[in-house]
């Protein structure tokens, strides 16, 4: 959302100072949510999908910046191996599902099948149709087993995607982010729109609905997504109290000389 108030710059984007203050506040709440998930033994699965450069990685980074990787962990699966290609399609994702007291963030997910794989011709039409039939029931099964499933689709316009790809292309330190798949995705932007619309038609279910995050303004998108994520839980502050640090125990021991160790050069 943009507006004419002083939270936004002349281009209608959220100001950095507003973003920084709000992000700090939200990250504090994410830490509290983390403790609540642990204390209640909740199993939370958050799916992040969208086009290349839509901002999925950015929001995942901010969610995990202050939380414990033992409780809030990222699952970003590589391309399937030859063995995995012979398995039930959902099988390789199952081992990454959350146990009690965990939140798992899926940076792309089984929805590769109905999006990038279908667009690029990496799956057959029969495989695509079977996915659309079986995915809703798979997710209902997860929900029935006690897993909270949240699905976010980051939506970036063709114009903004082009700007972000060009920015990566112009910056040597970021050029590695611009892959051949990104170039193909750019060319097939309309076909990706078809894939997304079909995916929603079949998988936007009551038990695990899709939530669309407009992401042309990355800052606003991150804040909006995290705010919504927090709103899905009626959590309480169960953070542990401050502890008293023990004094170092006096144990008779003489350490070896420091000069016997190899130190890195003191450049700074």
Name the predicted role of every residue range.
Residues 1-268:
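Glycine-rich phosphate-binding loop of ATP-dependent small-molecule kinases
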């Amino acid at each position: 959302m943009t507006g004419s108030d002083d939270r936004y710059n002349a281009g209608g984007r959220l100001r950095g100072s507003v973003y920084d203050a709000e992000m700090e506040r939200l990250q504090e709440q994410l830490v509290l949510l983390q403790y609540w998930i642990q204390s209640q033994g909740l199993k939370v699965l958050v799916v992040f999908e969208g086009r290349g450069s839509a901002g999925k990685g950015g929001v995942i980074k901010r969610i995990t910046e202050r939380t414990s990787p033992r409780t809030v962990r990222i699952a970003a699966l590589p391309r399937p191996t030859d063995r995995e290609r012979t398995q039930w399609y959902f099988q390789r994702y199952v081992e990454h599902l959350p146990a009690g007291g965990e939140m798992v963030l899926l940076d792309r997910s089984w929805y590769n099948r109905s999006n990038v794989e279908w667009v690029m011709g990496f799956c057959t039409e029969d495989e695509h149709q079977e996915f659309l039939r079986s995915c809703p029931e798979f997710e209902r099964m997860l929900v029935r087993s006690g897993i909270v499933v949240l699905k976010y689709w980051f939506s970036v316009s063709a114009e903004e995607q082009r700007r972000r790809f060009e920015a990566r292309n112009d910056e040597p330190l970021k050029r590695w982010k611009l892959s051949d798949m990104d170039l193909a995705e750019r060319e097939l932007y309309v076909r990706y729109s078809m894939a997304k619309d079909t995916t929603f038609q079949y998988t936007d279910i009551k038990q695990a609905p899709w939530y669309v995050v407009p992401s042309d303004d990355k800052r606003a998108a991150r804040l909006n997504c995290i705010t919504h994520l927090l709103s899905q839980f009626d959590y309480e502050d169960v953070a542990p109290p401050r502890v008293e640090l023990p004094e170092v125990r006096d144990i008779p021991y003489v350490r070896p000389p420091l000069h016997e160790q190899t130190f890195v050069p003191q450049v700074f």
